[in-house]
Structures are given as structure tokens and as C-alpha cells.
UniProtKB/Swiss-Prot annotation:
Lineage, broadest ranks: Bacteria, Pseudomonadati, Pseudomonadota, Betaproteobacteria, Burkholderiales
Disulfide bridge map: none
SUPFAM superfamilies recorded: Ribosomal protein S10
Transcription recorded as keyword: no
Pfam families per UniProt: Ribosomal_S10
One GO MF term: tRNA binding
Known partners and oligomeric status: Part of the 30S ribosomal subunit.
GO cellular component, one term: ribonucleoprotein complex
Protein name: Small ribosomal subunit protein uS10
One biological process term in Gene Ontology: translation
Record InterPro entries: Ribosomal_uS10, Ribosomal_uS10_CS, Ribosomal_uS10_dom, Ribosomal_uS10_dom_sf
HAMAP family assigned: Ribosomal_uS10
Length: 103
């Protein structure tokens, strides 16, 4: 018999928010009797941009900006109905993107 598994992937620009959200999800799942594997930190993606400081001349003078996207991965093995209900009612911060897959 195959076990059901919920895979949760979190993405955010702020690592503090994503760690706080991951801790809330783990606490909620453990309270309802599910087994949690993770959170596993995935590689941080850095996107860099070069922007000209001057609108007219001085091509060599540029600003460098970057956006870092932090990611975490969690697996909830054998979730109960209580676990699914508790995860649906969970209120996470606005800056965290959550992807949930049933496997």
C-alpha cells in the first residue's frame, strides 16, 4: 500500500519570514500527528541587475541590484484529515509563496 504524502514548497525574498512560516507548518503538522520531513533549504536564487546611474552619459557608472529568492521544501508523510484541515486554516505572512502537491 502506497503512503500518501504532501509536499510543501515555500518561496520568499526574506529568509526570516520563510523560516517562521516553515516552523509554523512543522508545529501544526506535528500537533495533528503527522510525520514531517524537513524543512530542507534549497539553493538561494540570486538575480542581479545593472542599472545606469546617469540618464545621458557616464556609461561606466552603474548601480548593481540583486533579488534573492529563498526556498524551503517539506514533506508531510501520512497526513490525517486533521492535518489537512489545520494546514488549510493556517495563516501565513503575505510575503511567502506556498506550493502544495499531493503525491
Amino acid at each position: 500500500m502506497s503512503k500518501q504524502k504532501i509536499r510543501i514548497r515555500l518561496k520568499a525574498f526574506d529568509y526570516k519570514l520563510i523560516d517562521q512560516s516553515a516552523a509554523e507548518i512543522v508545529d501544526t503538522a506535528k500537533r495533528t500527528g503527522a510525520i514531517v520531513k524537513g524543512p530542507v533549504p534549497l539553493p538561494t536564487r540570486m538575480k542581479r541587475f545593472d542599472i545606469l546611474r546617469s540618464p545621458h552619459v557616464n556609461k561606466t557608472s552603474r548601480d548593481q541590484l540583486e533579488i534573492r529568492t529563498h526556498q524551503r521544501l517539506m514533506d508531510i508523510v501520512d497526513p490525517t484529515d486533521k492535518t489537512v484541515d489545520a494546514l488549510m486554516k493556517l495563516d501565513l505572512p503575505a510575503g511567502v509563496d506556498v506550493e502544495i502537491k499531493l503525491q
